[in-house]
Swiss-Prot record:
It is found in: Cytoplasm. The gene is murA. This is UDP-N-acetylglucosamine 1-carboxyvinyltransferase. Belongs to the EPSP synthase family. MurA subfamily. The modification 2-(S-cysteinyl)pyruvic acid O-phosphothioketal is found at residue 115. It comes from Nitratidesulfovibrio vulgaris (strain ATCC 29579 / DSM 644 / CCUG 34227 / NCIMB 8303 / VKM B-1760 / Hildenborough). Phosphoenolpyruvate binds at residues 22-23. Its main location: cytoplasm. GO terms for molecular function: UDP-N-acetylglucosamine 1-carboxyvinyltransferase activity.
Amino acid sequence: MDKLVIEGGVPLTGTINVSGSKNAALPILMASILAEEPVTYTNVPRLRDIHTTNKLLSILGCPAEFEGDTVSVRPCDLKPEAPYDLVKTMRASVLCLGPLLARLGEARVALPGGCAIGARPVDLHLTALEKMGARFELEEGYIIGRCRKLKGAHIYFDFPTVGGTENLLMAATLAEGETILENAAREPEVVDLARFLIACGAKIEGHGTSVIRVQGVPRLHGCEYAIMPDRIEAGTFLVAAGITGGELLLTGCPWEELDAVIVKLNAMGMHIEKTSEGVLAKRRNGGLRGTDVTTQPFPGFPTDMQAQVMSLMCLAEGTSVVQENIFENRFMHVLELVRMGADIRISGRSAVVRGVKRLTGAPVMASDLRASASLVLAGLAARGTTHVQRIYHLDRGYERIELKLNAVGARIRREAE
């Protein structure tokens, strides 16, 4: 197991290229199951979850090959079972459920794993698929799904679930008739999935709004498709510029998709602007100021940026309040930040952050993907040395982060524990 060792206190200066989006790539790769012809993806990040997805696709009968940032998938002899050995490491693996039911009429998918950050029930997926004619039972830790042919249905989500919207969107492309997804997730990654499916021949309208309409088609063909840039990786590097007092230019950075994050960072005393070369981020003269953040579904402030911005709040003048409305138990990074000298108090789904003058390096332990990023950011700004343990979480969502940070002046290295 590896750890990161960070010598803090160095302003980061230079250019970072933003990788392809993990959260877009995972469902789009799963959608390969729907196509009857080869599919080629570019701008795919080389991450642990992507490699796991490629292995899963190969086991399901869609051999996937990775070369550079390109993944080629060749659907051939489809099989319905997603085994526990792969699914246990990644919650997104449940996204193969809808495509398998649409193509084969059956699926046997182990209950998913992934980050332990609260309840992420698959019930919303199953209830919606049942409205399309699927039947489910739980057997020895596996979701067993069967259907003759999925039928179009009017589905209302009680909450704009991203995974549920993606699963139903994929299933609906090959269903008989029209499917309407109401109170659907509007996240950019959902829009990217819809655009990919349309490129394969699907008939979809309304993606990016709360009502998506899908007219089922008999088959989907192959295509070539470029994965969108990762807005969460980009947001993490924007915070890195602010927390170290440096100046970073992000190339390939999604601008519109980061609006809620940029508004808050500018309010805290950063200057972020779009230029002809990319997105420029630096700290304004006068230091950082506290602000309040409430996580919400898109286009609100993303929960996946909450932990990183909290690290910045730790060094901002005044008091900041974070309200976490999406996931339970997503303050697991707080105790580790406190070990570094942060002043944070938790009350239910709220965290009150009182800014301090400095953070101090310490041994800390990552509990999930975004908590890992939060601790790396804190380590970059801290006085002294920070050891971030259990970075396998980090490797699930950030492509070679230590190499990218070192290239702009950070002193960070990976060591075996």
